C-alpha cells in the first residue's frame, strides 16, 4: 500500500491464495468483503484505490523454481513478503542469479527482521543464513502466531528500502540485518 501511495510506477504481486478471514488481522490490504477473493485481485483493487496512476500487475501463482525468473525479470527491486524458508531462499537465489536487488523480511510473534541485498554491495540472505533450519526447528507463523502490527512495521520498512533504492537516496540496509522487537 505504501508503494502505491508513494507513486511507484509499476508493482507486481504474486500469490495463488484467496483471502481468508484469518488473514485480516495482519494483512490489512484486504477487508471482510474480500474474503474468498484472490489475494492478488484484492491487493490490486486496494492499491489502485489509493493511487489510480499506479500500474499493478498480478500473478495468481505460487512462486516456484520454474516461474521465479520470469516473474522478477521486469522489476527493478524485489520485495520478499513470504512466510516460509524455502520461498525466502528461492527468492534470494533467483535475485542473486539475476543480479536483482531485493528486501528480505521475516516476522514471528512480536519480532521481525529485515535486510536488503544489492548486487556487489553486501551479503545476500544465503550468505547470512547458509541453509534453511531443519524441519520443525523453528515454528511456523501459523504455529507461533504473528502480531499484525509487526507485519505493518516491517512491511513499511521494506517499502522505504524500495523507495530509497529507486530514488538513489539514503542508506540501505545492505550489510546489516535489522532486528526489531515490539516488546
Where are these regions (language model features)?
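Adenine nucleotide-associated cytosolic modules
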Residues: 1-183
Amino acid at each position: 500500500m505504501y508503494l502505491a501511495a508513494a507513486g511507484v510506477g509499476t508493482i507486481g504481486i504474486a500469490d495463488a491464495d484467496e483471502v481468508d478471514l484469518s488473514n485480516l488481522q495482519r494483512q490489512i490490504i484486504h477487508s471482510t468483503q474480500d474474503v474468498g477473493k484472490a489475494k492478488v485481485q484484492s491487493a490490486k483493487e486496494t492499491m489502485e484505490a489509493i493511487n489510480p496512476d499506479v500500474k499493478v500487475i498480478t500473478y495468481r501463482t505460487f512462486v516456484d523454481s520454474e516461474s521465479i525468473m520470469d516473474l522478477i525479470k521486469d522489476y527493478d527491486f524485489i520485495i520478499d513478503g513470504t512466510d516460509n524458508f524455502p520461498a525466502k531462499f528461492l527468492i534470494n537465489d533467483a535475485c542473486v542469479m539475476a543480479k536483482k536487488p531485493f528486501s528480505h523480511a521475516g516476522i514471528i510473534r512480536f519480532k521481525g527482521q529485515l535486510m536488503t541485498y544489492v548486487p556487489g554491495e553486501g551479503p545476500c540472505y544465503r550468505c547470512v543464513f547458509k541453509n534453511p533450519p531443519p524441519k520443525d526447528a523453528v515454528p511456523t507463523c501459523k504455529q507461533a502466531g504473528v502480531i499484525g502490527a509487526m507485519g505493518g512495521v516491517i512491511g513499511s520498512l521494506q517499502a522505504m528500502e524500495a523507495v530509497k533504492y529507486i530514488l538513489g537516496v539514503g542508506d540501505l540496509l545492505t550489510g546489516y540485518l535489522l532486528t526489531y522487537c515490539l516488546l
